[in-house]
Amino acid sequence: MQRMFMLFCFVNMLAAFACYTFVTQELGLIFALVNVLVMAETVFTYPKVGLSEMLYLAFINIYCTWLPLHMIALRLLDNGAWMLMSVFIMVWICDSGAYFSGRAFGRHKMAPHLSPKKTIEGAVGGVLLTIVSAVVIEQFLPLATSMLHTCLIGLLVAFGAIVGDLFESYLKRSFGVKDSGKILPGHGGFADRFDSFLLVAPLCFYYFSIMQG
């Protein structure tokens, strides 16, 4: 069953590259084939594969594939490369701002059972600095049609980054691991560096899509 999970994730991540290279039709076909094969596996191995395993598989599909795909989808929008880079910058500023604000002013724990070092004051500092960074970026690269929309983009990025970081901490606590892997030596796994982007990407993609009509 574990090998099936790993194969499922691997093929779906290949679908992400198909999305970037071949746009939408081939991606849809790959997803359809993979999911039909997984359903066939559950049918012919029942009751070996139960509902809990299928729900786990669905979560993997969402968290490891559907959410990251929005980074590529964001890149494919008009001025997508600049938008994606701007989002990355804002997320990094949010993370750094929350860290240093928490170190300087942190008093009240935000989620003590998940991440004892994160504070409400740190989160507020991260949000404010992200909004400021969105306004600064707007001077060089138009992100929105008004200052209000620019501030909303900064707020969305900060909200998604903070929740994404906490959710990855929740996953690590649930699975009893310190880091999500050793892909990046000294920095933990892939998710330890990019957890904040996973929820920000879909928020920004749909927001920018609505603004572009």
Regions from the PLM with identified roles:
Residues M1-L155:
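Membrane-embedded alpha-helical bundles of polytopic integral membrane proteins
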